[in-house]
Amino acid sequence: MEIVFEDFQKALSKIKLLRENANIIEETVQRNVSEIVRNVRESGDEALSFYTKKFDGVKIKEFRVSEEEEKRASMFVENSFLEALQEAKKNIISYHEKQKRQSMFDCASEGIIRGQIIRPLENVGVYVPGGTASYPSSVLMNVLPAKLAGVKKIVMVTPPREGGIDPHILVAASLAGVDEIYTIGGAQAIAALAYGTESIPKVDKIVGPGNLYVALAKREVYGIVNIDMIAGPSEIVVIADETGNAKYIAADLLSQAEHDERATAICITTNIELAKKVEKEIERQLETLPRSEIARESINRNGAIFIVPSIDEALQLSNEIAPEHLELHIKEPMNALAYVKHAGSIFLGPYAPEPLGDYLAGPNHVLPTSGTARFFSPLSVDDFVKKSSFLSYTEEALRDVQHHIVELANKEGLHAHARAIQIRFEEEE
């Protein structure tokens, strides 16, 4: 892992280059995704079967997971896993319940009523990755906010594999309250949820993380359905001063690096000695890490330690990066919170490591990446509702303001708009 001594602008340029390298998308991948989406839209289940055999090596007769298979799954999971899942569910619910909002009813003045109605989405599709790891935690993080919002039907898709779906995923889905589960993955699953097929119902919104093909497919179908966000590779920035613990920092950087070779792990510190210790500690921990090959590639390609003169400059640099995860291993981290403008999720102090947020604390782990924390937010209850405004005016209330409306409409050249107001107050013949 490279230790970099640069001024602010050079450091920022280097970080941007790291991110750009992590987000390079080959044109052939985009073309492949577009073709998959088009074929699923046109051929439905036939295309799903073809791509499932091609990419997953599995021939599936029935895409939907039976209730019997869901029930059997509990026989193959450990009690300790169930206890952990239930604790996570409790915390996720208690946190997200506080995000719920009420409809608004405003009697602005005599004869005027206006407001906003908040209603849940009717159908939501949740993508749960398979790939190199299984993510029961993603089931809870994506499904529970939707349930709290009041979504009527939640459909889950997850890639098939020999021997069936991981029972831990099925148990998590049952605990969270998923209504239907289908064994499809990749871009073809996203297309199926967006357009519907003979077997897969069309949904109103698709949420959940996935690989590059999934992310590009979500971008492709956005507008046909809504999506949560287009997630890039995982990323973490750790800001540390001389009080930082090198073992903790190295472990936290590797916790993101093990996700994906394209993940980004960056440490920004004011202390050169700590930087050297973190570098050595990363090498030491990599030796025993089960997913060391992935993590090492990520660290070598997209990892770095930056030396800066002050924590203020470290925070400025982090704000320019707008990372998915930001850890503050500094004195009085709570005091620095006010200066963090852009980050998906912020972890304060040495005993609030990123995996705490990933699994158990309650805040959502579906977070904006690739600098989009400047304008996107973590997944929340708000993502599963829609809002409609309403208004009511009496004849007298409209009469009082008619001249303003006519003036504005005529100024914009929309004379039928003006006429729609004027006609209500003309003398009837």
Curated annotation (Swiss-Prot):
Keywords assigned: Amino-acid biosynthesis, Histidine biosynthesis, Metal-binding, NAD, Oxidoreductase, Zinc
Residues that, per the record, bind substrate: 234, 256, 259, 325, 358, 412, 417
PROSITE patterns the record matches: HISOL_DEHYDROGENASE
E.C. numbers: 1.1.1.23
Gene3D superfamilies in UniProt: 1.20.5.1300, Nitrogenase molybdenum iron protein domain
Sample GO molecular function, one term: NAD binding
InterPro entries the record matches: Ald_DH/histidinol_DH, Histidinol_DH_CS, Histidinol_DH_monofunct, Hstdl_DH
Family: Belongs to the histidinol dehydrogenase family.
This protein's name: Histidinol dehydrogenase
Annotated source species: Bacillus cereus (strain ATCC 10987 / NRS 248)
Lineage, opening ranks: Bacteria, Bacillati, Bacillota, Bacilli, Bacillales
Encoding gene, per UniProt annotation: hisD
